[in-house]
């Protein structure tokens, strides 16, 4: 069929025969056999150049055998495109490349021709600086032997590797790896095309995966303003576990007492809230959202938070919750009181209002009707926090109005109030927003602020009148002359929602929703004291001194004026009036000391919870604190009150004795005493209005105490004058300055009254 040719490579002086290569005639043509050498380098792509490839035009097999007949081939890996990648870091000395063409001539004879790979020309003689090769071509099909000219070809024989690649058509097969030289370390590198390398650490530091968007104005609020709220300290032995309220007895509590959203990792962020500078809406961080929430028309500052223990689901059993079968009723957590809410029956809603859901991790929308009433998901406990800026608007929160300059979040309410609400799908909360004035901002609690709810049951239903009060503090709402009161008319079957509009005054929400209140849970008639989240009120010594002056001097000034007026009207002498005034002062001094001691020993009134646990001294109320101040300053209070009592008590008799002393005109003396005493009473009335809480009107206080002084002085003078005339008419007085008592005593001893004047008749 064909002829066979044997190849002999140069060795160390000996010739080794190789297996003949079987070549079929007219079917196989060896096109190229290229052997290239490469230098050892890392990272250099020599995968293609590090192999010896034999390509055939048809399916055939060819083999090359090395020393000793052992075949050693490198491990090739295909990259999927028919190309092979070889090991790169094989350290092979630089050798010259020879290209061998084995071609069958037309005359049927085989020949082998060697080419220099670098020069690209046929090598017929000696190779420069390397070795000389002798080439013998056997045209008759016999063996061809190559003899080296020198011994330098031994290194080429040791470090060269022969690679066999068998191609079956166009499909390549995996080859075995070439054994490396002893002591060499091979590093494998696979070069992939179109691969970009990046600094992962810098990318992770710079990237921002999520942003927090305001649902109202669609602005990023992640890097806006972060407000930190102060924790409210609550004694656990008094209020129990504030983080796990009982479902049967839910309690209002402040947002500061809510548990952390994600456990211990987010406990540090529990006291932070996010405020958008565009629309001034405050949000509680609860997670991130992959998409920004579109702006919606909703209530600013209305935060509805579901109870972490009861998840809000749309498949909740509302039928069992209405009839009391479901024991896990939703609890409104706010302050220290709660309202157990069932569900009302509103029509389907279309618009969406974003709701902060701390148990989920993102801002969840809720449905809202076109009238503004926000619909909460069923079985969700709601907590509404309202606050405002320093404008003249008022805020109604749990029946309490907070007016000018007052800002607060959810108040601490310690009276538990239960309201049953008929609701088909969800409980409703009024959420209209009509102005841009009412903004959320936290305040610091005070120590003496409380609200007074007066509940009356009239023909029109249950009516609650709420009054804000803070003991021992100046006027809480600057610019107001009367205490802030509001009346929430619960009616017989419904409660109208109350909201903050930012304008002065209180507006009630629409008639939707209607809240039915069961008769068993209505409050009885009476008054309930509910402490509000307190504003910090600093009561210094000046305020307490002013209170002590008012306490000791106001009533004594009125009393002393009445005594002097009565004595002057009865026609007593100046000396007798002075002595009478001083005697009255000494008797009153003993009484005021007794009153101060009794006031100090009086037990204070403390606000208690349902568990009969006191809330501590900061919620102490009593007459002493309201009239004088702190009990630890009793010595100061008593001293100032006694001095004020003496000064105001001695003023009328001294003025009466020393005024108009030359003329001895009784009417002028009475007028001077009345003017001096009235001036003193007016000053004390102004001070009384200043130290009163809530601060009253100065004009009303002046008119009130001034009218009392005028009436006391006038009535005393008239009564004294009338008694004098009555005694003279009945002969119990001879017109002298002898007291009436002495004349009556003489008559009892057997002497006739007016005996010395019998001769005149």
Curated annotation (Swiss-Prot):
Induction: Not induced by NAI1. The keyword Endoplasmic reticulum applies. Residues 48-65 have a biased composition (Low complexity). Residues 22-31 have a biased composition (Acidic residues). Residues 1-85, 120-162, 338-374, 416-448 are annotated as: Disordered. Belongs to the CCC1 family. This is Membrane protein of ER body-like protein. The lineage of its organism: Eukaryota, Viridiplantae, Streptophyta, Embryophyta, Tracheophyta.
